[in-house]
Regions:
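Glycine-/small-residue-rich beta->alpha transition segments that form the dinucleotide
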Residues: 1-8, 28-31, 128-141
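Glycine-rich dinucleotide-binding loop and its adjacent helix/turn
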Residues: 3-65, 154-169
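A conserved short coil-to-beta-strand element within the FAD-binding core of flavoproteins
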Residues: 4-10, 103-114
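Core beta-strand elements of the Rossmann-like FAD/NAD(P) dinucleotide-binding domain
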Residues: 42, 121-130
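Internal hydrophobic alpha-helix adjacent to the cofactor/substrate pocket in enzyme cavities
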Residues: 58-72, 151-153, 171-191
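Rossmann-like dinucleotide-binding cores of NAD(P)H-dependent redox enzymes
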Residues: 59-105, 165, 191
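SH3/SH3-like beta-barrel fold
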Residues: 115-119
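FAD-binding beta-loop-beta segment adjacent to the flavin cofactor pocket
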Residues: 137-159, 168
Length: 191
């Protein structure tokens, strides 16, 4: 249950992502290896595919480590789904740390040490020491039908909530959790 990285059928993606000893990570792969990344990455190249909230989290993490960062976004602007305060803060951070911003650029192929991307000026290689594919999250609710079957004969209400229903932002999950607690309190299940 919950959500997992969205990994579309892009040439080389599944061959390279989150492989032991590899250099290409999903956000979950990054989190699982967060302590393995050096504190000082000066002179190292980081390439991030995806200019949404998750990709920008990766940028923020590595900018503090003095890496040379490039972020690739297929849309015309980076951080389109962010609230205005966060978007402005990220723009300032990217400017301060000299992050290369490549908009209207799409991932074509994933290689061991580079991404092949295509923008308005054609296709080119984007080399990296560490590459990150942050194209969003997708719901993983495969256990929900099993839970419905398991409790079909009981007087138990089963709800599919959170990212297993639909992947979304943390603020949405927080609001949903608050609403569930409110309704449980109203029904007398919580004091």
């Amino acid at each position: 249950t919950g959500s997992g990285p969205l990994l579309p059928p892009i040439k080389g993606l599944m061959d390279n992502i989150d492989k032991e000893g590899g250099n290409v990570y999903s956000i979950l792969g990054m989190i699982n290896h967060i302590n393995d990344f050096p504190e000082d990455l000066e002179g190292k190249k980081i390439a991030v595919i995806g200019g949404g909230a998750v990709g920008l989290d990766v940028v923020e993490f590595f900018a503090a480590r003095k890496a040379d960062i490039s972020i690739v976004e297929m849309m015309d602007q980076i951080g389109r789904d962010l609230d205005p305060v966060t978007k402005n803060d990220m723009k300032c951070q990217m400017k301060t740390h000299g992050v290369h911003q490549l908009t209207q650029t799409a991932l074509q192929e994933v290689k061991e040490h580079s991404f092949l991307v295509k923008g308005s000026d054609g296709s080119y290689e984007l080399p990296f020491d560490y590459g990150f594919v942050c194209l969003g999250m997708r719901a993983k609710g495969q256990l929900y039908p099993q839970l419905l079957d398991a409790f079909a004969d009981d007087d138990v209400e089963i709800l599919n909530i959170g990212d297993s229903q639909r992947a979304r932002r943390i603020i949405d999950g927080t609001m949903e959790g608050r609403n569930i607690l409110y309704h449980l309190t109203q029904r007398g299940y919580l004091d």
